[in-house]
């Protein structure tokens, strides 16, 4: 169960989410539709614990996701833009993510980079 309770998130003078409340039952699939700047990605970032809501809370399976290592290890968020540390390559990014995610599989990373001819 995903619960969003009165979530508000602002950036300077722009309010991306304004008192958003919704419940998504286990096994349900929803899509979000909206124009650029409507708050879709912001809501997903709050749900994945990347952003902290200014007000309200995001709860998954009864657990608040922000600053919760256990829950973050169970979630993945793939943004529409790639994130790389300045000057980083794939191996340094893999090392970075392995330091954040306990279940990051370096052997699988190496296998996939070889399979797809990446370096």
Where are these predicted regions, by residue range?
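Conserved ABC transporter NBD signature motif
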Residues: 56-67, 71
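The feature captures the beta-strand-to-loop junction immediately N-terminal to the Walker
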Residues: 30-35
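Conserved structural motif at the start of ABC-family nucleotide-binding domains
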Residues: 2-4, 17
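Helix-to-loop junction immediately C-terminal to a conserved catalytic motif
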Residues: 48
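Short coil-to-beta microelement around the adenine-binding A-loop and adjacent beta1/P-loop entry
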Residues: 14-15, 69
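ABC-family P-loop ATPase nucleotide-binding domains
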Residues: 79-119
């Amino acid at each position: 169960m995903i619960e969003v309770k009165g979530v508000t998130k602002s950036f300077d003078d722009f309010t991306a989410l304004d008192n958003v409340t919704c419940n998504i039952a286990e096994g349900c699939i929803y899509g979000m539709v909206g124009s650029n700047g409507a708050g879709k990605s912001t809501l997903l970032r709050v749900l994945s614990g990347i952003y902290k809501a200014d007000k309200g809370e995001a709860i998954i399976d009864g657990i608040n996701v922000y600053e919760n290592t256990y829950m973050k290890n169970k979630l993945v968020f793939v943004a529409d833009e790639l994130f790389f540390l300045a000057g980083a390559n794939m191996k340094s990014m893999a090392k970075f993510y392995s330091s954040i995610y306990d279940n990051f599989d370096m052997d699988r990373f190496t296998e996939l980079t070889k399979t797809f001819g990446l370096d």
